């Protein structure tokens, strides 16, 4: 039997209505891509996809990027967020794009995109 938590406890533990869903994203620039192009593309990714959709991106890389996408506020990403990110990466010439399934970012963080 699962333990019953009050609202304060659920908020602290990110459970039930406070659960946060996100997804991992990996992508790669073509070998030899100039650093200026990488910077410009990542800036556009944030300005055109992440911020307008109320998302947050925590990631890093040079030619190969990997990171976590979640909502800026407490909440749950959905399939439309995954598809929007994936489509933008595809239409902007990035390679080896991987977008994970949605997962609980506090309790189910995967070690890699599956």
From Swiss-Prot:
It comes from the Bacteria. GO terms for cellular component: cytosol. InterPro entries: YggL_50S_bp (IPR007416). PANTHER family: CYTOPLASMIC PROTEIN (PTHR38778:SF1), CYTOPLASMIC PROTEIN-RELATED (PTHR38778). To E.coli YggL. This is Uncharacterized protein HI_0341. It comes from Haemophilus influenzae (strain ATCC 51907 / DSM 11121 / KW20 / Rd). The lineage of its organism: Bacteria, Pseudomonadati, Pseudomonadota, Gammaproteobacteria, Pasteurellales.
């Amino acid at each position: 039997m699962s333990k019953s938590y009050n609202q304060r406890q659920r908020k602290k533990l990110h459970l039930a209505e406070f659960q946060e869903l996100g997804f991992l994203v990996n992508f790669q620039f073509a070998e030899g891509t100039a650093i200026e192009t990488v910077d410009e593309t990542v800036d556009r990714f944030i300005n055109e996809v992440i911020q307008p959709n109320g998302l947050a991106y925590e990631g890093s890389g040079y030619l190969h990027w990997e990171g976590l996408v979640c909502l800026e506020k407490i909440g749950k990403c959905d399939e439309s967020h995954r598809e929007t990110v994936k489509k933008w990466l595809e239409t902007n010439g990035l390679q080896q794009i991987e977008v994970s399934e949605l997962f609980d970012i506090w309790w189910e963080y995967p070690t890699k995109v599956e």
